[in-house]
Curated annotation (Swiss-Prot):
CDD domains: RecA (cd00983). It is found in: Cytoplasm. HAMAP family: RecA (MF_00268). Disulfide bonds: none annotated. Keywords: ATP-binding, Cytoplasm, DNA damage, DNA recombination, DNA repair, DNA-binding, Nucleotide-binding, SOS response. This is Protein RecA. It comes from Shewanella sp. (strain MR-4). PROSITE patterns: RECA_1 (PS00321), RECA_2 (PS50162), RECA_3 (PS50163). One of its GO terms (cellular component) is cytosol. The lineage of its organism: Bacteria, Pseudomonadati, Pseudomonadota, Gammaproteobacteria, Alteromonadales.
């Protein structure tokens, strides 16, 4: 198809102007696999790191993770903290829900002795603490759990039944304007956990929305929709969840990709199981019947035993992880091609919110 050279020139000029004004990566072609050269922190899941395009969550940005109850939101953020601490980074957890379990966090690999934790009384206090930590330049990762629990001071001091229309949204809007610039300067990753609410009277499209108004949706560089898709059983006992995460917004790489992994109760993300699955899909690990082999050596009969072998041999697991990252991050499309046809449908996009449903 012939393209008008004047239009092509005008498009190049406006794209250059937009990127100059709003930053590199603020606009790109949907089919581009280009990712920005940004520092990232692993999410704890290889497939999610690949789906994000840059190899993890970007530093100096705002990230929103939302989903239904018990879908793995807090577990995912604790995995991010554990990964950051392994790199020697300082992390803080703003526990607005007053529900953080330090024993569970420790099981996921979080160094609780060096994790800063705050349980603020009001939403304003929580956001001021975030801003102070950000401006200090000494904290690398801040988690806020959750936006729905950031209650404005006026609402706390008022009575139950009082109307406070738009108060939380105004508070979040003001905080986002203040935080966004400081985060970039200090290279701090700020992750907000959010809950889902239903819009009343929606006949068509996605009735789901998130709390706290629209400011967070706008300022977030990455938005992740996390869902529990099934149960993992050992006999009759449920031992974990099958989890799917959709990247519904991404300003550092192409959006709308998705990742699937397992979250095991008391253990977190099943990394070795993920390595086995992706290794087989990309022919790094050979599978003959029920036996799995790596470089000609048998590593286990059945997926669980192969995963156990990798857990007991971290050097081999790290080697497979490194090879898969190099392969998949250079060609992110390979991740989706390894999924089964029924799990790889394109889905529908709500262009008002950027959500896939």
């Amino acid at each position: 198809m012939k393209v008008d050279p004047n239009k092509e020139k005008a498009l190049a000029a406006v794209l250059s102007q937009i990127e100059k004004q709003f930053g590199k990566g603020s606009i790109m072609k949907l089919g581009e696999d280009r990712s920005m050269d940004v520092e990232t922190i692993s999410t704890g899941s290889l497939s999610l790191d690949v789906a994000l395009g840059a190899g993890g969550l970007p530093m100096g940005r705002i990230v929103e993770i939302y989903g239904p109850e018990s879908s793995g939101k807090t577990t995912l953020t604790l995995e991010v903290i554990a990964a950051a601490q392994r790199e020697g980074k300082t992390c803080a957890f703003i526990d607005a829900e007053h529900a953080l379990d330090p024993i569970y966090a420790k099981k996921l690999g979080v160094d609780i002795d060096n994790l800063l934790c705050s349980q603020p009384d009001t939403g304003e206090q929580a956001l001021e603490i975030c801003d102070a930590l950000t401006r200090s330049g000494a904290v690398d990762v801040i988690i806020v759990d959750s936006v729905a629990a950031l209650t404005p001071k006026a609402e706390i001091e008022g009575e139950i039944g009082d109307s406070h229309m738009g108060l939380a949204a105004r508070m979040m809007s003001q905080a986002m304007r203040k935080l966004a610039g400081n985060l970039k300067q200090s290279n701090t990753l700020l992750i907000f956990i959010n809950q889902i609410r239903m819009k009343i009277g929606v006949m068509f499209g996605n009735p789901e929305t998130t709390t706290g108004g629209n400011a967070l949706k706008f300022y977030a560089s990455v938005r992740l929709d996390i869902r529990r898709t099934g149960a993992i059983k050992e006999g009759d006992e449920v031992v974990g969840n099958e989890t799917r995460v959709k990247v519904v917004k991404n300003k550092v790489a192409a959006p709308f990709k998705q990742a699937e992994f397992q979250i095991l109760y008391g253990q977190g993300i099943n990394r070795t199981g993920e390595l086995v699955d992706l290794g087989v899909a990309h022919k790094l690990i050979e599978k003959a019947g029920a036996w799995y082999s790596y470089k000609g050596d048998k590593i286990g009969q059945g997926r669980a035993n192969a995963g156990k072998y990798l857990t007991e041999n971290p050097a081999i697991a790290a080697e497979i992880d490194k090879t898969l990252r190099e392969l998949l991050l250079s060609n992110p499309a390979a991740l989706s091609s390894s999924a089964s046809d029924d799990e790889n449908s394109e889905g529908n996009v709500d262009f008002e919110t950027g959500e896939v449903f």
